[in-house]
Regions:
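Alpha-helical structural motif
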Residues: 67, 86, 149-150, 162, ...
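Internal mixed-charge
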Residues: 193-201
């Protein structure tokens, strides 16, 4: 067998010749894994986007890729602002809520995420959260729960109850036991799980179905409960329609 120079972008061709009985091939793949994990520890995890797609037995209807370059186009901020963990968590949200299978609803959701967070500039509520202390409807039963569990992520998920539900869901569904979610609250989750903290809220509110059946305006209303910032949401929706393909 004659092999030519490996060209960037032809990783699939490279693995066509992979021989699991060849010790050099095995060592090379092990080295590749080490280098991938050095770049991004989550790249080889069970919930990484490419791993989930690889294991999926059905063909995806939409092939959205959440990359730093896409976020640069959507927000106008430089790509370096959006690290791999941020992009992975965004992809995780869209996959776990079913949005990744529907292009137009994905654009609707992204536009609202962008508006609610000022293009992902604010992933923690600016207010102190003191006003949420003692709010039983948020399950804030402990002193200091208000600031600890103030608005988190692009959708500003708020309250001990939501954080405990997210912790339980992540442990039971994904096998990820991360007690810091409840121990540290918003300051930790906004960095580690800015998007996935909203999975439960989106699913409980049937947001995908709302988008599919009733469209963009209904999506905005379900998220906002009104029409605050509607012109900006529309503007961001048009940006998403231009770049999310």
């Amino acid at each position: 067998m004659t092999t030519g120079r490996f060209e960037p972008g032809k990783l699939l061709d490279f693995f066509t010749w992979f021989d699991k009985t060849n010790s050099n091939h095995l060592a090379a793949v092990a080295l590749l894994q080490e280098e991938c994990e050095a770049i991004d520890p989550d790249m080889m995890s069970d919930y990484a986007s490419w791993v989930r797609l690889y294991r999926n037995k059905t063909s995806p209807a939409v092939s959205l890729k959440f990359t730093p370059q896409l976020f640069e186009k959507l927000t106008g901020y430089p790509a370096r602002r959006f690290d791999p963990e941020f992009c992975h968590d965004c992809a995780y949200l869209f996959e776990e809520t079913g949005f990744s299978e529907h292009l137009e609803p994905s654009r609707m959701l992204m536009a609202n995420l962008m508006h609610e967070s000022s293009n992902f500039r604010y992933l923690k509520e600016i207010a102190s959260g003191e006003a949420y202390n003692g709010r039983l409807d948020l399950s804030n039963t402990e002193p200091g729960d208000g600031p600890k569990f103030r608005g988190c992520g692009p959708l500003q998920v708020t309250g001990r109850g939501h954080f405990e539900a997210f912790y339980n869901w992540l442990r039971d569904s994904e096998g990820i036991d991360d007690p810091k979610i409840v121990e540290l609250g918003t300051n930790y989750v906004a960095e580690k799980y800015p998007f996935s903290i909203a999975v439960n809220w989106i699913n409980r509110n049937n947001l995908l179905q709302v988008c599919l059946e009733d469209g963009f305006d209904a999506c905005c209303y379900r998220i906002n409960g009104g029409w605050n910032g509607y012109p900006d949401r529309i503007n961001k929706y048009e940006i998403c329609r231009k770049y999310m393909k």
